[in-house]
């Protein structure tokens, strides 16, 4: 998936997550910044979820900022998929291609 421009999804409310993405010059790089109110407990799980979604949609060449306020895994995945669709100017997600 090609990221065309910067985008934002989510809020900074409790139990939610705000994710921001922007393309960078190196089309193979991944600049990932995660801050979470529950990072000590769930930091590894948050990072694994983010990387899983990015790998599933074959996203590289981006800066991704994750500001988590205790969001559940399903919320994080939904916010990331929304973010990718917005940044790639997709009208709909390719649901049929999901494993």
UniProtKB/Swiss-Prot annotation:
InterPro entries from the UniProt entry: CitD (IPR006495), Mal_deCO2ase/Cit_lyase_ACP (IPR023439)
GO cellular component, one term: cytoplasm
Main subcellular location of this protein, as a coarse class: cytoplasm
Cell location: Cytoplasm
The keyword Cytoplasm appears for this protein: yes
Alphabetical UniProt keywords: Cytoplasm, Phosphoprotein
O-(phosphoribosyl dephospho-coenzyme A)serine, modified sites: 14
Subunit architecture: Oligomer with a subunit composition of (alpha,beta,gamma)6.
Function: Covalent carrier of the coenzyme of citrate lyase.
Protein name (Swiss-Prot/TrEMBL): Citrate lyase acyl carrier protein
Organism: Edwardsiella ictaluri (strain 93-146)
